[in-house]
Each structure stands twice: as C-alpha cells, then as structure tokens.
C-alpha cells in the first residue's frame, strides 16, 4: 500500500458551491488551505469527503479551497519529520500570503509534530486527532478501548496516547507491525477486536480510503477522512495562540540597544530559555540623528522611525520599545498611524520617580540638547508634579561632547574624559539641590550602571535609568498578557 515515490507537486484552487438551504447574502465565505499528504490517493479521498461534508451541512459557510501537494519523499525518522516540517511550513506561509483562513492537514504522519506547526504557524491548523477524539466522545461515549492501526513511527512517538488521554482511553495496537495491504488491514482489525477493542481507527493516511471496504468487522471502524472533513466544515477554529512578542527599534544607538536587551533578559523571571520573551529587533543605525534634527542641523528622522516601527508591526510585534530618549520627541506623530502601541519610556520613567519619591519636588536631567529643547521630559515630569532641573549651557556643552565627541560614549568610550565631564555635570546638579537624576540619554547608563553614586563632596545621589525602567515595564506587560 505504501508508495515509495514522491508525489508530484500539485496546486489548484477550487470553489465549493454554497451549501443547500443557505442564502448567499447570509453566508460568509472562508478559505481553506489543504495540504496533501504523502499519498495522492488519500488526498483525493479527503477532498471528496470535504465537498460532501460541505453540502451535507446546511449551516456551513461556503468555502474556497486551496489545495497543494508538494513533492516529498519519506525519509528516515526523525530526519524525515524535520524535512517534512520545513516543507509544510513553507506551504502554510504561502497560504497566508494568499489570504487563506485556516490550514487542513489530512496526514497522520504530520500529527507527530503538529504542536510545532501550530506554535510556529501564522494560520490556525485544524487538528485531525482532536477531530477524531471529539467524534469518539460524541458518537461512542462508552468506548474506552480504542484499536489503532498505524505506523511504527507514530506508535513509538506515542501520538495516539497523547491525544486519547490515559484514564479515559486505552490504546490498543495489532500484535505485529509493518506495511498493510487491504487484507492485512482486515486481519489487523480482527486482531484488535480479539484484544477487546470497542472501535478501530485506521491511523495511516494510505489506509483511510479503504476503511469502508473492509467488509464485516465485529466492531465499528471509523473513517478518519469523513470525520475530519465534518470537523473542518462545522468547527470554528480560534486564531493560533502565540506568545507575546516585543518589538524593539534598535540602532538608536547600537550600544544602547544591546544594553536594553540585556536588561530585558535580566528582568524576565525565566527558569529556562523558553520562558524568555520573543523579541524582534529592527536594528537601523541609519535613522538620522534625532538631536541634530531637533537643534536644526540634521535630517528629519520621523519617516525612518515610522518605517522601522511598521516593520516591527508587520513582524507581529505586540508592543514597541524605543530605547532612545530623544526619539520620543517623534512618537506623538507616529503612534496614530500604528496598530500596536509604543510604550513611552519618558512617561513610565516620570511615573516611576514619583512612585519612589512621593514628596520629591524636582529632579535633575542629563540628556542631549535635542531632548532638552523638545521639552518632552519637562512635560512628562510636570504631569507628575516634578520640576526639571538641567545643567547650565556651558556644562550642557560638555555633556554633548561627552556623548558625541571623538572620545564620547557614541564613539565607544565608557571611561576617561567623557566620564569625568559628566561627573562634573552631576556635581553641579547636586549643588543646585538635586537628590535624584534621570540619565536621559540611553548611553549614559553605560558609564554609570550604579543606582547611587557619591559626589566628591560626599553627597549621595540616586541615578534613574530609563532603559531599565522601560525593560521592566515591557516584561511586566508581557507577563500580564501571557496570564490572560
């Protein structure tokens, strides 16, 4: 029965007519992407039963069917599974590009890795074994001993045991393993009946077309293709569950992006790799300098920032973080054109300062001249009842040199003259009565990773790192989404 030749590549689109009894104006057309298995005859059998199920269900919608069968040979397991997964993923991706709503996979071999497909698929995949389990519970509520004729590979993987849970069902197999002809399939069913099976599932795609041609068998033999077709037609599949994905506008600047990602990892309560956040980074250091534009000397970065955010949105990000203080001067214009939120680092920083220091009247700010001139921090702090205190112009010039100069932070320096210049600025702010200072340029925490420092005069001052607060907030939002 088993074909050793690869099925030829085949793709076509067919329109299933509206089911009887439905008014076309009341029907919502849906699109199904059917992926043929390793056996062309089995694929044809399923398509026929899908059409029959659609016509038999008067409550069903009409369907467009996109069918594709790619050339693929059986490989040695598990290498064969891995190769098959890649083929199926490519087909599903092509279905998504064509506007298909959900994927139909009438192939038992693929059920061994269906969880991986569902976890990575952009489309919901109708579960063949879930359809069979629901059918058994509904049509055979008293059945507990389920006979299954399937491949040795699926037996070894425990595919049916996973889907028919122990305690509710007992899975029985024939007392031999190998290829099945129609006659051997009949003998296998007899053997299962003798073992006490109360019903039988042919669990090989190439056997399914012959399930109803076995002749008299003492226990019911399910037709998986018919059951699956009825399930696909009648059941509404929810969109695939996917983990929260954080989108990061990177490259503004590059070192600050790496520092931010490190903080996201550090603040994630993870016990293994899989507990961490999915993160999509669009590293675009070619975005024009934000400060140069704000002080009237450079190109407008709005479009580049927007285009980068749109790429993150297209990549299915749920939330966007921009680890650049000055870039937030452009968020107000960009956000209305996006379908996903940008978390405002300045707003969450101002809120954090107020929560930590309820009676604090003012806060110092170290930032680029562009950030200061835009007033974005001043407005965020005012909403929290905080007054912004900034360096005087000569020291602000030293501040800019420490960031942008030839020995500045953006040039890769994290010690030496740049650190000394910023230390002088901090000393001046402390003399103005400042007790808390916001490191309002994302490169500054690279120089001052501590939460507190002591001035030369012995005064303690708290340093607030906006990227650390942003990372914590991103993680907390991700955790909140995952527990819904």
Cite the ranges covered by each PLM segment.
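Short terminal hydrophobic/aromatic SLiMs and anchors at protein ends
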Residues: 1-2, 16
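Non-catalytic structural scaffold of enzyme domains
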Residues: 10-484
């Amino acid at each position: 029965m088993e074909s050793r030749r690869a099925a030829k590549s085949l793709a076509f689109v067919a329109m299933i007519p509206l089911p009887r009894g439905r008014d076309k104006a009341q029907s919502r057309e849906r699109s199904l992407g059917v992926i043929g298995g390793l056996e062309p005859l089995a694929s044809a059998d399923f398509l026929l039963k899908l059409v029959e199920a659609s016509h038999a269900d008067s409550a069903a919608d009409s369907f467009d069917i996109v069918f594709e069968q790619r050339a693929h040979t059986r490989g040695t397991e598990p290498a064969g599974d891995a190769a098959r997964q890649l083929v199926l993923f490519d087909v599903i991706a092509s279905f998504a590009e064509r506007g298909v709503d959900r994927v139909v996979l009438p192939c038992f071999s693929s059920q061994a890795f269906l969880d991986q497909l569902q976890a990575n698929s952009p489309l919901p995949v109708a579960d063949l074994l879930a359809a069979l389990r629901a059918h058994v519970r509904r049509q055979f509520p008293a059945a507990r001993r389920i006979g299954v004729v399937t491949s040795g590979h699926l037996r070894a993987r425990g595919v049916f045991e996973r889907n028919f849970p122990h305690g509710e069902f007992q899975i029985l197999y024939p007392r031999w393993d190998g290829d099945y002809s129609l006659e051997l399939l009949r003998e296998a069913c007899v053997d299962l009946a003798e073992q006490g099976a109360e019903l039988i599932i042919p669990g090989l795609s190439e056997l399914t077309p012959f399930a109803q041609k076995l002749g008299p068998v003492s226990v019911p033999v399910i037709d998986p293709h018919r059951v699956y077709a009825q399930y696909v037609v009648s059941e509404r599949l929810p969109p695939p569950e996917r983990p929260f994905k954080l989108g990061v506008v990177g490259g503004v600047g590059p070192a600050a992006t790496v520092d931010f990602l490190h903080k996201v990892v550090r603040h994630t309560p993870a016990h293994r790799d899989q507990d961490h956040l999915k993160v999509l980074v669009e590293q675009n250091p070619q975005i024009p300098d934000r400060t140069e534009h704000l002080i009237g000397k450079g190109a407008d970065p709005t479009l580049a920032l927007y285009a980068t955010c749109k790429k993150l949105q297209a990549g299915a990000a749920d939330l966007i973080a921009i680890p650049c203080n000055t870039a937030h001067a452009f968020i107000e214009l960009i956000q209305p054109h996006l379908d996903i939120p940008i978390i405002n680092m300045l707003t969450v920083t101002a809120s954090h300062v107020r929560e930590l220091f309820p009676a604090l009247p003012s806060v110092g700010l170290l930032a680029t001249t562009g950030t200061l001139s835009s007033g974005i921090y001043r407005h965020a702090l005012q909403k929290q009842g905080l007054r912004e205190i900034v360096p005087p112009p000569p020291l602000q010039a030293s501040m800019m040199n420490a960031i942008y100069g030839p020995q500045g932070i953006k040039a890769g320096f994290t010690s030496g003259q740049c650190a000394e210049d910023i230390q002088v600025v901090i000393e001046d702010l402390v003399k103005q009565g400042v007790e808390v200072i916001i490191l309002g340029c994302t490169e500054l925490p690279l120089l001052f990773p501590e939460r507190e420092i002591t001035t030369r005069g012995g005064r303690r001052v708290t340093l607030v790192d906006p990227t650390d607060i942003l990372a914590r907030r991103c993680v907390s939002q991700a955790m909140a989404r995952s527990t819904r």
